A protein has these predicted regions:
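Metal-dependent peptidase/peptidase-like ectodomains
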Residues: 1, 22-24, 74-180
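Soluble metallo-hydrolase cores and metallopeptidase-like ectodomains found primarily
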Residues: 1-41, 51-67
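Acidic/histidine-enriched alpha-helical segments
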Residues: 63-71, 102-105
């Protein structure tokens, strides 16, 4: 193993799909592009999901009322959320005035992650998110207050957030497998 220390420039990839009625207003969908080691679950699954969401939204862009920004943060694992923190600092006024929600896409669809007992969301999104999870999975979810982690760098700007944590392994299965 080789450990490189020091400052480095990391690209922050962002796709913007402009809405037709209120293009200045936007939803920010984000995940992280860096990872420790292979990173299939954390966060190749999220990156693949965001690419597919971008493709579908682009195909249906004429129907979008508001803009969607999709960002892939560098420095999540290796910089303790440096990319999203930089973005929040750099675009704070725009985010505070125009971002209507931000959705984290970190490690969705991982193997055995079939439980929704620890879903991070702000209070104002509980009803909408609960309905979406029930409609898709048939499960009730247990909302939890978002932690100060996982690229949730926008809380101090007053933006609604959800899915810092989404599906996870059922507790019994984690114990059976000896996972923390």
């Amino acid at each position: 193993t080789f450990l490189e220390q020091g400052w480095t420039h990391c690209p922050l990839v962002e796709a913007t799909i402009t809405g037709s009625e209120e293009p200045e207003k936007f939803v920010l969908l984000h995940g992280h592009i860096d990872s420790w080691h292979v990173g299939i679950g954390d966060n190749a699954t999220g990156n693949a999901a965001m690419l597919e969401i971008a493709r579908i939204l682009w195909e249906n862009r004429a129907d979008l009322k508001r803009t969607v920004r999709i960002a892939w943060w560098p420095g999540h694992s290796t910089g303790r959320y440096a990319g999203s923190t930089w973005y929040a600092d750099t675009f704070a006024i725009d985010i505070a005035e125009n971002c209507i929600a931000h959705i984290n896409c970190d490690s969705p669809g991982c193997r055995w992650a079939t439980s929704y007992h620890d879903v991070s969301t702000m209070t104002e999104a509980v009803a909408m998110l609960g309905k979406a999870i029930a409609d898709v999975t048939g499960q009730q979810f247990q909302p939890e207050r978002p932690l100060r982690a996982g690229d949730i760098s926008f809380n101090n700007l007053g933006v609604t957030t959800f899915l810092m944590l989404s599906s996870t392994m059922p507790e019994e299965l984690r114990q059976e497998k000896g996972y923390y």
